[in-house]
Amino acid sequence: MSMTTIAPEQVNRIVWNQHHDPFEILGSHPIEQNGKTVWVVRAYLPNASAAWVVLPEQRQEYPMQTVHDPHFFECIIETSELSNYQLKTKEGEHERVSYDPYAFRSPRLTDFDLHLFAEGNHHRIYEKLGAHFTEVGGVKGVYFAVWAPNARNVSVLGDFNLWDGRKHQMRKGATGVWELFIPEIGVGEHYKYEIKNFAGHIYEKSDPFGFQQEPRPKTASIVSNLNSYNWSDEDWLEQRRHTDPLTQPISVYEVHLGSWLHAASAEPAQLPNGETEPVVIASELNPGARFLTYRELASRLIPYVKELGYTHIELLPIAEHPFDGSWGYQVTGYYAPTSRFGTPEDFMYFVDQCHQNNIGVLVDWVPGHFPKDGHGLAFFDGTHLYEHADPRKGEHKEWGTLVFNYSRNEVRNFLVANALFWFDKYHIDGIRVDAVASMLYLDYCRKEGEWLPNQYGGRENLEAADFLRQVNHLLFSYFPGVLSIAEESTDWPMVSWPTYTGGLGFNLKWNMGWMHDMLDYFSMDPWFRQFHQNNITFSMWYNHSENFMLALSHDEVVHGKSNIIGKMPGDKWQKLANVRCLFAYMFAHPGKKTMFMSMEFGQWSEWNVWADLEWPLLQFEPHQQLKKFFTELNKLYRSEPALYTLDFAREGFDWIDCSDNRHSVVSFIRREKDTENFVVVICNFTPQPHSHYRIGVPEKGFYTELFNSDARQYGGSNMGNLGGKWTDDWSMHNRPYSLDLCLPPLGVLILKMDKEKTAKALGS
């Protein structure tokens, strides 16, 4: 037996998992012996009673001896070169032959990768960090890399090593990234990182860059290949690249995939190759029900949205989250679509099918905060790595969550790359950034003494603002034609202005003021609305300060607020008429549109994340008629350019009359870009019809009634103008001509001059 080549204290550092670079000890090393170079192979094999080095090309085996520990093995081989060796181990009654992870010494991360990551500018860091199935030296396996700069040791845990952190200890690089290639494992492996801090405490963490996770309540990451899906949306992406979305119709159906519709547990799931088991809903309200899969949703949700005529689907957060009741807004797996509904490839299929049906996909993105779950980002390497250490900057007490440290380059890089990732790998068409105000203000939901000012003594979070600018600048550079939408509830200036003008760089901002004004106005008894005309007109005073999206979202139908129809006054007929009036005005008003699921058929109850929507209501005619109303409203909106091409230009909107508060009537003109086409909109916000209501119009001719929210097919009283009206040579509202109209109760009319009919009649 030859003499050992390693000191006991070095062996102990491996045995006790205390070495920052196990490659210094384990694997193969050239040494000088008797004046010549030989090779020593060392391995720590906790479950082995005996081991051999196998040279498959030479068909030779060399027995290994134990040194300083019964499971630490060493073997000296007299050869000038050593490569592609394997280890044969005896574990109980079984023998196995495998490649040694510590034989693969070359790091996959280059110095340039690490440099870019350290300065916060590696835009595709998700292709480097995380778990990646690859091939090294002709051997297939998985490369693992994780950023944990303050950890004492990091190991990979998984089924492949019986979740034993001693077996696959990682190497730490100069920038705090730990890495290891594990041969002969592949896609589908479950894994975590075992992280030990300098106090000896051990944390088991999911992979921050993991592409897939186990269904809750389990928390392991899963090795996944995101490059295997064959996309069929090239035409969609090419058209998007050359289209300005701000001049296009955007009508968004906001949906929570986990509660739109459920399936009975006995209903077979559409799953590819049986890869994923259906996930049961954890709710007593729906015992035995399960979530629909992404593929089932593709076959049910997409045709429904297409029938209704929406241009986009907006998904409440689909990144992995442990608690169903968070609606997805407490994310632990930023790079993993939730496994509640299937695999990453299943979600790709869903997006692909949306695009093939001419429906865009928007995703809610949550870069403002993250939960404290032990397997997630919180206290990741035994220190406050992703969050601020000081709770005055690092904690949202109202939500019980932690705040990202945007001043740390690597954290900012994690988030910036994450935004780009969803567009790159999943072909989404836009993000809605949640709770932007909570990011921008250091004193958000904090009392005096509970927050720290910025370097200038102000309450603005300058690092967060810079982060948002960086995200939006890169987003539109890499993916022209996409949407970045801010849910920003304050008067922070220039949210939807380009970054080169000093703006935050979003191209749309939710108009929270309009939403509050509208819901306040429509909840009033109509006879009192005359005293609150400003609710209707005020939005046009500031409309051109931002690119606004008008949104009636999930936030307005929860927490005791009731659903939209429940907010309306009057009997059932008036409630439905008010709903039609509200949405017809919304679609005629400048700005893009978003509405939450269930509003389209008049659900009475609040949204409940644990239950289906009230689909049985569609058995009843009033709810069928309301659904028909939204179908026709979307059809009109998409077909009439005057309603969307100049949403954000002053020349796209003119009041005809906004001062008739006595009757609670407003009228205005919407104009089409680069043409002389326009539509006239008249809104009557009371149940009192007007048989002779005159408004001024700019041109003489016949005005066709394109849309009447009071039509019988929508459940209305069917008051209208028999298809249209000729103008009178009677000036009104500073216009040379006027129309004598019949205004229906709680109704909205949209008219357009028929130029062909007018020309024939007037002989021009």
UniProtKB/Swiss-Prot annotation:
State the superkingdom.
Bacteria
Q: In which pathway does it act?
A: Glycan biosynthesis; glycogen biosynthesis
- One Pfam family of this chain: Alpha-amylase_C
Q: What is its EC number?
A: 2.4.1.18
Q: What Gene Ontology cellular component terms go with this record?
A: cytosol
Catalyzed chemical reaction(s): Transfers a segment of a (1->4)-alpha-D-glucan chain to a primary hydroxy group in a similar glucan chain
InterPro entries noted in UniProt: A-amylase/branching_C (IPR006048), Branching_enzy (IPR037439), GlgB (IPR006407), GlgB_N (IPR054169), GlgB_N_E_set_prok (IPR044143), Glyco_hydro_13_cat_dom (IPR006047), Glyco_hydro_13_N (IPR004193), Glyco_hydro_b (IPR013780)
MF-aspect GO terms:
1,4-alpha-glucan branching enzyme activity; cation binding; hydrolase activity, hydrolyzing O-glycosyl compounds
Active site: residue positions: 434, 487
Q: Broadest EC class? A: transferase
Q: Which PANTHER family match?
A: 1,4-ALPHA-GLUCAN-BRANCHING ENZYME
**Biological role:** Catalyzes the formation of the alpha-1,6-glucosidic linkages in glycogen by scission of a 1,4-alpha-linked oligosaccharide from growing alpha-1,4-glucan chains and the subsequent attachment of the oligosaccharide to the alpha-1,6 position.
Q: Which family does it belong to?
A: Belongs to the glycosyl hydrolase 13 family. GlgB subfamily.
Q: How does it assemble?
A: Monomer.
> What is the name listed in the Swiss-Prot or TrEMBL entry for this protein?
1,4-alpha-glucan branching enzyme GlgB
